Amino acid sequence: MAQLYYKKVNYSPYRDRIPLQIVRAETELSAEEKAFLNAVEKGDYATVKQALQEAEIYYNVNINCMDPLGRSALLIAIENENLEIMELLLNHSVYVGDALLYAIRKEVVGAVELLLSYRKPSGEKQVPTLMMDTQFSEFTPDITPIMLAAHTNNYEIIKLLVQKRVTIPRPHQIRCNCVECVSSSEVDSLRHSRSRLNIYKALASPSLIALSSEDPILTAFRLGWELKELSKVENEFKAEYEELSQQCKLFAKDLLDQARSSRELEIILNHRDDHSEELDPQKYHDLAKLKVAIKYHQKEFVAQPNCQQLLATLWYDGFPGWRRKHWVVKLLTCMTIGFLFPMLSIAYLISPRSNLGLFIKKPFIKFICHTASYLTFLFMLLLASQHIVRTDLHVQGPPPTVVEWMILPWVLGFIWGEIKEMWDGGFTEYIHDWWNLMDFAMNSLYLATISLKIVAYVKYNGSRPREEWEMWHPTLIAEALFAISNILSSLRLISLFTANSHLGPLQISLGRMLLDILKFLFIYCLVLLAFANGLNQLYFYYETRAIDEPNNCKGIRCEKQNNAFSTLFETLQSLFWSVFGLLNLYVTNVKARHEFTEFVGATMFGTYNVISLVVLLNMLIAMMNNSYQLIADHADIEWKFARTKLWMSYFDEGGTLPPPFNIIPSPKSFLYLGNWFNNTFCPKRDPDGRRRRHNLRSFTERHADSLIQNQHYQEVIRNLVKRYVAAMIRNSKTNEGLTEENFKELKQDISSFRYEVLDLLGNRKQPRRSLSTSSTELSQRDDTNDGSGGARAKSKSVSFNLGCKKKACHGPPLIRTMPRASGAQGKSKAESSSKRSFMGPSLKKLGLLFSKFNGHMSEPSSEPMYTISDGIVQQHYMWQDIRYSQMEKGKAEACSQSEINLSEVELGEVRGAAQSSECPLTCSSSLHCASSICSSNSKLLDSSEDVFETWGEACDLLMHKWGDGQEEQVTTRL
């Protein structure tokens, strides 16, 4: 390893060490820039403002500098939610860059408002984008503010951006092959996929859908379905797209949760999209929205309790309190209606609008009648299989029996019902239901059976022993197909289990297991074909004839199995039945003494059994267990969705009569047929004006009804959205709890409040100078208290340099002594003192006042020290804690006993580069002088004449208490 760093390892003194260094070093910040960013971090408004002002004059600070984390001052202010410093930085034209995106990600609403209202000043020089490190940006180029806000799902920020009329790129179709999609995918496929994912992630935001969509429920339906289909195409991001699809489904369900009355629920579920092609625009109150939800597989929406409550009310219409009745009463009621279904059907045929005719149209009654009709059909199939009517078994073309004649109307009724369903719903919707495919297979088998029986009846008239019939005799094939159709007819009854809460989940689990079996069969057939081909190739040469076998029997069905692998078909059968243990091992033996061939054959046969039984069969069991567990975890939702589909099939108009009564033409059917024939072949001579008026009237009525329905729907949606947003914000605040961000905000608030208090006490901010006492009165009070000290203060002056351009303040130490104040002075001295600068006595009073506030009131024997630049009271023995222990004790005592005369202070540059070693230098630059209460003496010197007037009385009181018994000593260093 050391050879990677040194060429000559043997002669290296550090050959047993690996040297480390920073290979990707970044530009280090200067002390001023570090102090500037530190002030922004702590919320020190005054220091930040001073640094910005100095940067405009001296260019000693890069206001767009970044810390090691890549955060500029503006981003730090956004992270700390310090809007005052943000506004200050924006007023000084800092580089904004991705600040808006950063504020959106941090969900700082105030910062977003401030940045949206920010306008770059005209004529100002802005930092060009190319000068910034674009590769270090945390956001990809395709991310826009509205997309990022939608990703965070912050309702307030999304609302602010939508009010600015922002836009989102419209995603192309899933399998779009346009020039733009093809070229984008070829240039950078990762960026193309990521960009599509970011767009859909933004579009799937519940807050964005609630704000910008006229029909948020329908938008969630379509978007969820599109995302589900997209997950099948974009396999790399399948989990992300499925999560977004589930998010859309939950949003639609949560929106429906906010419905508070049956009226609102009916308006939502009966609303129809005018642009929808799959629904008839002439029908109203047909649960159109619920049909769309079923079409898009919105299981959560359909299984929502409010929706199920309305469906149950419609389903049990005419049977109030049905669920509260005893199960015996329910059973007797259903059996009674079931036995009466022929009479109810005949009553409907004769008079559809009578009481009995309207009674059978109720969904629950219709369901019972159809179930009773199907059970009757199964009973007749049972009678047909038992051969109650005896016939000659050796007749090649037997005529139909009485039971078969009774079965025929039911078969025709089933076929007619399937034709009507395919005509009403369309072929695509018809084949999407697996039960329809099963019905199609069952009806096809019945038709084939009837056709073959007719052929046998016409072609074969004689009687012949059945053992002598050929293998493909029509009667034999018809009997086989009829047996298969009987099995399918009996299994079709499982679909009715969905109506029961106990059998429904089991029926759904069975359907999922069938899918697992199909997946398993695909792999199993591949293994079966592979071993069948190998074994057939090995044993093909050892095939024997039937006459050479016992009892002239050849194959695995013989008493002694033989020739199990002689042909490919026989090999496939043998391997299949071996899974169930029905094949013996001696089938791998051959009559010749070819032991190697027998060994290879037995090994291949054993390997097949290990793979099929141990591996594949256990894999199938695991898959079926997983499918059952998946249904069991969501049993309630899956069952309610399946039950709703069953109920909806009986809510629709049509299909009222069960088989076989549905094939009987009703008077209503004759009326409809007559009207169609009359309008088609015998049109009446009607003036064009009358026809146009009729069309205009009907169009106006439909349009008015549509407008009224849409207005009611929009009112309900508006209320639902308001309730949803309120609940979302309330839940987010409840679930959030105390996080690390809350403690950071609290820390920042405390820090900002601290500096605000310091500014208030130190009067560092210009806007807060609202004082009442005049400077003349303050000077008079000061001269009165100072006594003869004021005369000495006239000859002394101190200069402060505000613009320290280097890291250390250059200039000699300004240390002076000031005796204790004596008695009151005369009027002339007061007048002369009022003409002087007010800052000297005021600063002296403030120094004493701050020391009093800080709790550093020293005992008479101690000698306290005060540094105005730091505002921290320090004892002389504390110098060792701040790395000045090397100072001599005598110099330290001299420094502690020295005083400064602050009667006259002038603004200007401190001339001279010599620096004193007697007193420690407390600050290295103007940015580092804001560490405590009086953080910046330069800020104090910038104050106007009225700054210190409000502190006059408090300072006088402290001066009297302080002056009794000890000498005032103040030490300052700049």
Curated annotation (Swiss-Prot):
GO terms for molecular function: calcium channel activity; inositol 1,4,5 trisphosphate binding; store-operated calcium channel activity. It comes from Oryctolagus cuniculus (Rabbit). Pfam families: Ank (PF00023), Ank_2 (PF12796), Ion_trans (PF00520), TRP_2 (PF08344). One of its GO terms (cellular component) is presynapse. It is a multi-pass membrane protein. Ca(2+) binds at E418, E421, N436, D439. Forms a receptor-activated non-selective calcium permeant cation channel. Mediates calcium-dependent phosphatidylserine externalization and apoptosis in neurons via its association with PLSCR1. Acts on distinct neuronal populations in the hypothalamus to regulate innate behaviors including feeding, anxiety (flight/fight/fear), socialization and maternal care. It comes from the Eukaryota. It catalyses: Ca(2+)(in) = Ca(2+)(out). Homotetramer. Heterotetramer with TRPC1 and/or TRPC4. Each subunit in the homomeric ion channel (via ANK repeats) interacts with one copy of GTP-bound GNAI3; the interaction is direct and activates the ion channel. Interacts with TRPC4AP. Interacts with NHERF1. Interacts with MX1 and RNF24. Interacts (via C-terminus) with CABP1. Interacts with SESTD1 (via the spectrin 1 repeat). Interacts with PLSCR1. Interacts with PKD2L2. Its main location: membrane. Zn(2+) binds at H172, C176, C178, C181. This is Short transient receptor potential channel 5. The keyword Endoplasmic reticulum does not apply. Activated by G-protein coupled receptors via direct interaction with GTP-bound GNAI3, which increases the channel sensitivity to phosphatidylinositol bisphosphate. May be activated by intracellular calcium store depletion. Calcium channel activity is enhanced by MYLK, that promotes its subcellular localization at the plasma membrane. The chain crosses the membrane at residues 364-384, 405-419, 434-454, 477-497, 513-535, 604-624. Keywords: ANK repeat, Calcium, Calcium channel, Calcium transport, Cell membrane, Disulfide bond, Glycoprotein, Ion channel, Ion transport, Membrane, Metal-binding, Repeat, Transmembrane, Transmembrane helix, Transport, Zinc. It is found in: Cell membrane. Residues 769-778 have a biased composition (Low complexity). Expressed in brain. Belongs to the transient receptor (TC 1.A.4) family. STrpC subfamily. TRPC5 sub-subfamily. Residues 1-325, 361-363, 420-433, 498-512, 625-974 are cytoplasmic. ANK repeats lie at residues 30-60, 69-97, 98-124, 141-170. Residues 766-795, 811-838 are annotated as: Disordered. Residues 972-974 are annotated as: Essential for binding to NHERF1 PDZ domain. Residues 326-360 dip into the membrane without crossing it.
